């Protein structure tokens, strides 16, 4: 149990650091850095809100659909931002993977608690 929680924390932190530090170095403008930080914060908040409501047993169809809509919009914004950012091709693959690793680690961390 403790090992899975440690792995979940590690996934969350490493995913967030690779995503944020990599894009911080790659994006020359502060607005681009803020854009990618906002995308990550929106995704982690939506993920947290859904998991918390699920844990408390307060899920209904409307809330689930809102969380799915926020997730789809956030993922769309991530891919549009990555495609328009002045980064290399391999970075266009690494940063979305780090984004999803961060969200997966957050989900595993919340469910292991």
Swiss-Prot record:
It comes from the Bacteria. The keyword Aminoacyl-tRNA synthetase does not apply. GO terms for cellular component: plasma membrane. Residues 21-33, 83-84 are periplasmic. It is found in: Cell inner membrane. Keywords: Cell inner membrane, Cell membrane, Membrane, Transmembrane, Transmembrane helix. The chain crosses the membrane at residues 10-20, 34-51, 62-82, 85-105. Residues 1-9, 52-61, 106-113 are cytoplasmic. It is a multi-pass membrane protein. Its main location: membrane. InterPro entries: YiaA-like, YiaAB. The keyword Cell cycle does not apply. This is Inner membrane protein YiaB. It comes from Escherichia coli (strain K12). The gene is yiaB.
């Amino acid at each position: 149990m403790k090992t899975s929680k440690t792995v979940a924390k590690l996934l969350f932190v490493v995913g967030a650091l690779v995503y944020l530090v990599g894009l911080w170095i790659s994006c020359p403008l502060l607005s681009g850095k803020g854009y990618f930080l906002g995308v990550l914060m929106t995704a982690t908040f939506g993920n947290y809100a859904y998991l918390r409501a699920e844990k408390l047993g307060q899920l209904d169809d409307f809330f689930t659909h809102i969380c799915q809509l926020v997730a789809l919009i956030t993922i769309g914004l991530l891919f549009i931002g990555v495609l328009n950012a002045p980064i290399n091709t391999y970075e266009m693959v690494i940063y979305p993977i780090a984004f999803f690793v961060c969200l997966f680690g957050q989900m595993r961390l919340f469910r292991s608690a």
